[in-house]
């Protein structure tokens, strides 16, 4: 009934297994990949013919983490998996980026890759297992896929690269100073296709070494997928890349010179209008048959690419006339919004970001319910890309995959320089509103985010800047590396290489390669050129701000205090009664954790002090021999009970009230009367013993009144 094919190798410290033929047999390709006890099922299906009029490749990658994989029940009202989490969206993009360029050009059949996490051992992150499973499923599916690829994660600790570090070591690098890198690399047998990383000011050489280590480490996995395919692959789908060479020559003859003139226009919107006019002019000179050719749009795009690429490689000339290593003009401004906690407007050429920082308290932390546990994040970065930023009227709604991915890239770049939570107990939310875009808006978010946080008073370890690099690589091996690429250079080039960091080193690196043949020499040169660009941008940013400014008067102030853990119950009170009273009386927000760390937040310093004093009076212990002011709360035959230390009561025995004999305490005391008392000590049962007779009741000083 089943035709099961199973292959396995020892990979790092775990066994990697690939299995097909047992489940999802109606899919074009189905593979379950298992690393340790983490298992991911990848299923591939593709249409056998394209939809009419389709002018792009409709590839969809889905990644879903099932809660049952870790023995958990989903939260929420419906108790089932719903919309994709940020992790699921980012992982889907992580898988999509290296496989998309490897489909045969011209293939426009609808293709679906679905990755489902079936089991999670809480040690091995399922994202890389999913990438391997997806690659294996594509390889055996018969789809025109020029893989396989494989991926791995690399850490960097004590100068050593670590293959597939445990998930607990990687999910919060800011609080794990020994681990300085979280790098994901995907590639084929011969080339690196994709890099994604979060780093702690690593040098260019260290980053390049990590990429090489990763590419070497995935070779056994690629061999394993090939071994599986030799026994389980389906017949290749009969698809030939369309030959539109004659059509392209006709398009080139009709429009190359005019297209070159159009691409000499520096203004983006004018250039786009001119390019559109050239395309329409080309179409007017084509035959009816050529106009109906489904490859016409591809031929026109190839004409654009040819013009741009030849100018870069042969003439060293770019669309806007810049040198290959030249950064566009930069204007950095801070304090652009009066009521926000911190704001910056970062403009680089025709790319602009309005970035705003808001400071919050512990109540504002983001709660994350992940397969490997629940945790909180006190740094949030949200990236918004409205249609008007590119002069279009389009969809407005919740963030898409691209916005989530760009936001996470900027988050990785900036979180490495944030102060420790113990030194800066605030929740920081950064929002990047892209108001203009012509390439590298995510890096504008990094620069603007750094400026905005410093404007808000966040004591960053160092300013951070980012730059997007591009590459044009010709068949003869000649190439040009571009600094600070425009949107057209991104779309028509062979590599998108984003690097962010401080003067000391790299904090984030993202690379997407569309072609094979990117050598280590090219990558090394690109990183060095990116460093020069980054340092230039940092110098321009320094004209606006170089260090954390003063807090906005509208931002909350937070004071922290540590109390003994056995006092937490007293501060909270029965049903939260005490802490609610503190909040109501003081007007401050009060947050307490299981370690006894209390955060008191308010824009008003007096509110913070009042809450601090109230908490201190609850948790502090009265000192023997000290004098305190108190209030008589109850009179009995043998003395008086005095409330003298917050809510603490003690007994003043009748013999300790005055230096003379009293018939009854009520002879000299009444309930509600304020008195001065001295703490004599505690009896065997811990009861407080107080005295009045040795304290001057007028001055509160030691020594009875005459």
From Swiss-Prot:
* Record-level GO BP terms: mRNA catabolic process; RNA processing
Q: Give any Gene Ontology cellular component.
A: cytosol
Cofactor dependence: Mg(2+)
Q: Per its UniProt record, what CDD domains does this chain match?
A: KH-I_PNPase (cd02393), RNase_PH_PNPase_1 (cd11363), RNase_PH_PNPase_2 (cd11364), S1_PNPase (cd04472)
Reactions the enzyme catalyzes: RNA(n+1) + phosphate = RNA(n) + a ribonucleoside 5'-diphosphate
Ordered alphabetically, the record's keywords are: Cytoplasm, Magnesium, Metal-binding, Nucleotidyltransferase, RNA-binding, Transferase
The protein's matches in Pfam families, at most eight in alphabetical order, are given as: KH_1, PNPase, RNase_PH, RNase_PH_C, S1
Q: Does the keyword RNA-binding apply?
A: yes
Subcellular location as annotated = Cytoplasm
Query: What's the family?
Result: Belongs to the polyribonucleotide nucleotidyltransferase family.
PANTHER family reported in the protein's UniProt record:
POLYRIBONUCLEOTIDE NUCLEOTIDYLTRANSFERASE, POLYRIBONUCLEOTIDE NUCLEOTIDYLTRANSFERASE 1, MITOCHONDRIAL
Q: What is this protein called?
A: Polyribonucleotide nucleotidyltransferase
